From Swiss-Prot:
<comment type="subunit">
    <text>Homooligomer. Interacts with the replication enhancer protein (REn). Interacts with host retinoblastoma-related protein 1 (RBR1), and may thereby induce the transcription of host replicative enzymes even if the cell is not dividing anymore. Interacts with host PCNA. Interacts with host SCE1 protein.</text>
</comment>
<keyword id="KW-0235">DNA replication</keyword>
<dbReference type="InterPro" id="IPR001191">
    <property type="entry name" value="Gemini_AL1_REP"/>
</dbReference>
<feature type="binding site">
    <location>
        <position position="59"/>
    </location>
    <ligand>
        <name>a divalent metal cation</name>
    </ligand>
</feature>
<keyword id="KW-0378">Hydrolase</keyword>
<feature type="region of interest" description="Oligomerization">
    <location>
        <begin position="156"/>
        <end position="176"/>
    </location>
</feature>
<dbReference type="GO" id="GO:0005524">
    <property type="term" value="F:ATP binding"/>
</dbReference>
<dbReference type="GO" id="GO:0005198">
    <property type="term" value="F:structural molecule activity"/>
</dbReference>
<keyword id="KW-0808">Transferase</keyword>
<feature type="binding site">
    <location>
        <position position="49"/>
    </location>
    <ligand>
        <name>a divalent metal cation</name>
    </ligand>
</feature>
<dbReference type="GO" id="GO:0046872">
    <property type="term" value="F:metal ion binding"/>
</dbReference>
<feature type="region of interest" description="Binding to RBR1">
    <location>
        <begin position="143"/>
        <end position="153"/>
    </location>
</feature>
<dbReference type="GO" id="GO:0006260">
    <property type="term" value="P:DNA replication"/>
</dbReference>
<dbReference type="InterPro" id="IPR022692">
    <property type="entry name" value="Gemini_AL1_REP_central"/>
</dbReference>
<dbReference type="GO" id="GO:0004386">
    <property type="term" value="F:helicase activity"/>
</dbReference>
<keyword id="KW-0190">Covalent protein-DNA linkage</keyword>
<keyword id="KW-0347">Helicase</keyword>
Length: 359
């Protein structure tokens, strides 16, 4: 007569199912953590589900640091803390931890301990395919969660193509720039020259009313005259200060106009594209793919007097005469000599005051 087969499972990851188990997830986890094993536990995930007959079941994934050779089929038995009852599991070695984790996630009532240990079994022919992994990443809702999904379900792609994946997810989960809220109402700028007011009425508006080729404006004046605050109070805009950042985190193709503030004209990239309100142009980035700019919106250039700031002085340089002839056809140049406001009209808006008082 053949000897009964002795129980033995030698695996790094275990999948346990406890049928008709009344323990809570927390009670089960506490007992599992007390089990003495020759290799450290790295991760435990427990799911509690109710079957059609109303009986509770527990599913568990246990990951060890190294292989655990289990020869006792009662090793993982659990006991009730309140009554004389033992719960015996079905024990299997988990060939793919990712697949087991996905399976026990299906009901949502889960408890985790430790850090999940990624394996590549799914990508080598398990239930999970690359398309499934990327579909799950897209449905994650957030970039950080999508990266976690790809790291777990497509680890090879995560390591070899991280740069492209990261860049693509920035596009998929693009976060629009937060709308700017001016601390001052436009009406509080009561010393604005007629020349500026007229320019605004002709060029700053939504796309339906905007001229096909708006005219830009260069405003030169001393510091603390209100140039920046006035320019930013006119409507939805892109604000580029000190240098140009045309990434989608900063630059919106839906803005009504651009504000370029305190950028030395000698080093202003895309001078003509901005000043000429040009449409459909590209900006090459140092480490990324070219950025497509919709364009067709005017730009307010703000500067102080001086050779490293003034657009007028820059265009008056002998080498820039051709550029100057082009610029005066595409922009107006205004020099202001006094603040655009009176002190009594520079109280913040009520909305801004509320924010300040709460801070």
């Amino acid at each position: 007569m053949a000897q009964p087969k002795r129980f033995q499972i030698n695996a790094k990851h275990y999948f346990l199912t406890f049928p008709k188990c009344s323990l809570s997830k927390e009670e089960a986890l506490e007992q599992l953590l007390q089990l003495q094993t020759p290799t450290n536990k790295k991760y435990i995930k427990i799911c509690r589900e109710l079957h059609e007959d109303g009986q509770p079941h527990l599913h568990m994934l246990i990951q060890f640091e190294g292989k655990f050779n289990c020869k006792n089929n009662r090793f993982f038995d659990l006991v009730s803390p309140t009554r004389s009852a033992h719960f015996h599991p079905n024990i299997q070695g988990a060939k793919s931890s990712s697949d087991v984790k996905s399976y026990i996630d299906k009901d949502g009532d889960v408890l985790e301990w430790g850090t999940f240990q990624i394996d590549g079994r799914s990508a080598r022919g398990g239930q999970q395919t690359a398309n499934d992994a990327y579909a799950k990443a897209i449905n994650a809702g957030r970039k950080s969660e999508a990266l976690d999904v790809i790291k777990e379900l497509a680890p090879r792609d995560y390591i070899l193509h991280f740069h492209n994946i990261n860049s693509n997810l920035n596009m998929v989960f693009q976060v629009p720039p937060a709308p700017y809220v001016s601390p001052f109402l436009s009406s509080s700028f009561d010393q604005v020259p007629d020349e500026l007011e007229h320019w605004v009425s002709e060029n700053v508006m939504d796309v339906a009313a905007r001229p096909w080729r708006p005219v830009s404006i260069v405003i030169e004046g001393d510091s603390r005259t209100g140039k920046t605050m006035w320019a930013r109070s006119l409507g939805p805009h892109n604000y580029l200060c000190g240098h140009l950042d045309l990434s989608q985190k900063v630059y919106s193709n839906n803005a009504w106009y651009n504000v370029i503030d305190d950028v030395d004209p000698h080093y202003l990239k895309h001078f003509k594209e901005f000043m000429g309100s040009q449409r459909d142009w590209q900006s090459n980035t140092k480490y990324g793919k070219p950025i497509q700019i919709k364009g067709g919106i005017p730009t307010i250039f703000l500067c102080n007097p001086g050779p490293q700031s003034s657009f007028k002085e820059y265009l008056d340089e002998e080498k820039n005469q051709t550029l100057k002839n082009w610029a005066i056809k595409n922009a107006i140049f205004v020099t202001i000599h006094q603040p655009l406001f009176t002190n009594t009209n520079q109280d913040p808006t009520p909305h801004r005051q509320e924010e300040t008082s709460e801070a």
